[in-house]
Amino acid sequence: MNTFGNIFKLTSFGESHGTAIGGVIDGCPAGIVLDMEFVQGELDKRRPGQSELTTSRNESDKVEFLSGIYEGKTIGTPIGFIVWNNNQHSSDYDSLKNVFRPSHADYTYFQKYRHYDHRGGGRSSARETIARVVAGAIAKLILQKKGIKITAYVSQVGDICLSKSYIQVDFSNIEKTAVRCPDLEIAKQMIALIQSVRLRGDTVGGVITCICHGVPVGLGNPVFGKLSAALSNAMMSINATKGFDYGMGFNGIHRKGSEANDLYYRNKDGKIVTKSNYSGGIQGGISSGEDIYFRVAFKPVATLLQGQLTVDKDGNEIQLEVKGRHDPCVLPRAVPIVESMAAMTILDYYLYNY
């Protein structure tokens, strides 16, 4: 499947070392002012080569819109866009054409398709997420007009964890450090860890926390159309994700029911709200009007700049030595991707309701 969404739909295309990455957005309402500076700014957050913590692949990632825009506004027709690939070093992958790299998609793609583009991971590369960020930026622009804001940040790298709740951190600090952690002291520790593993030719994983603020009551459907399930599906479609939980999540197993229920009361404005939000803003698969917050776990990058044993397509055991340019940790560049997938999911359900 290369299409995401039911009403607000994105179909992405392209491979890591192909001519370009792009997409077609269907179902976008007409009359939306397309803030190009904002859209490009979102792309710049996931762009490679932005700091010493990311791959040195030097791509400008400038988006070109091909259709669906007139006089700076959407016109309700399919929005086509493209981002050209300009800095491929495909020769770095010549020796890997017949090799199954550990914990990559090489083996499964070979078994499923037999013929595929192995360069830079081809279609399985995180470069595909360019299309998601463009579509997510447009979704954000629409949601902002509805009072809905999506914010994500790095809350853990390896064993370095930001233990504070999202309500205790200053979101304005997120873009102040290369690792996109809002706690500046914890961020320094995260950066030091990433630099340390990079020097050893190794990699490290972590967790991104995301908050959807201002989501109205009623988004989502019972049983198989749950908003929580849709968010999980969206997040687990991102490269290198290995886990998703929302609200108190897995930590809830340590609580008793009397410690985990969100009690209702009427606030000073006469609105029914809850005293806590252990449920993460979703009850019965339907948004409750409270903040929706969740966490996404990312594995360490599978490409290591150190030798590993593997096999080739004929089953011969070989010592794998990898070249190329790779992230020691995907977390900093994955923040805008998580936000984009959340924005598209929330907007898709919003358009269904309204």
UniProtKB/Swiss-Prot annotation:
This protein's pathway: Metabolic intermediate biosynthesis; chorismate biosynthesis; chorismate from D-erythrose 4-phosphate and phosphoenolpyruvate: step 7/7
Cofactor entry: FMNH2
InterPro entries with a match to the protein in the record: Chorismate_synth, Chorismate_synth_AroC_sf, Chorismate_synthase_CS
Residues that coordinate or bind NADP(+): 46
Keyword terms of this UniProt record: Amino-acid biosynthesis, Aromatic amino acid biosynthesis, FAD, Flavoprotein, FMN, Lyase, NADP
Assigned GO CC terms: cytosol
Any single biological process term in GO: chorismate biosynthetic process
MF-aspect GO terms: chorismate synthase activity; FMN binding
UniProt-recorded name of the protein: Chorismate synthase
Organism: Azobacteroides pseudotrichonymphae genomovar. CFP2
Lineage, highest ranks first: Bacteria, Pseudomonadati, Bacteroidota, Bacteroidia, Bacteroidales
